[in-house]
């Protein structure tokens, strides 16, 4: 199990493969495509099992979305929407070595987009801004991002990310197709809704990925 800092993943995986060990590695494998390719080559040469930690693929709710799309129940998929927002920013030292919002956070959404749509991405347009905390700008990163995807099957995708959602860990997915739509909302500790003269009140989303996934 490789869950060390990102810049050590590739070397450790290569050494584990050379030792004949099956490997589970936290994402990403590395920030360099060249090192990633060399690592994959080492794994294939060693003929060991290798898995990267994209935990959302095993979430029961997201699995239902994937099953619904792949079964054809909503027809040809047209638009995918993913909302992924953390409850609070990570420490500055982590930000500096994380590889940035796209490699550290959006990477899960890129994986989920390809998984749900069963199609590779042909075009990517992304914009990032610092709207939450100046610490991200000092680290050369962004804390807010919007990504537009075009898939090889012709569908479109939109991902929006933020490093801070004050109401909790915001994880939502929607796939709209020619014959219908499937969606997953946030998980909450309970589903009760309390109404009074000030409005409707319900539980906040689960705190973070440790609880959500």
Indicate residue ranges for each PLM-predicted region.
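Rossmann-like dinucleotide-binding domain that binds NAD(P)(H)
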Residues: 92-156, 161-167
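Beta-loop-alpha module in the N-terminal Rossmann-like domain of NAD(P)-dependent dehydrogenases
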Residues: 1-42
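Rossmann-fold dehydrogenase core element
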Residues: 38-55, 67, 75-82
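Alpha-helical elements of Rossmann-like donor-binding domains used by nucleotide-donor carbohydrate transfer enzymes
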Residues: 11, 38, 64-67, 112, ...
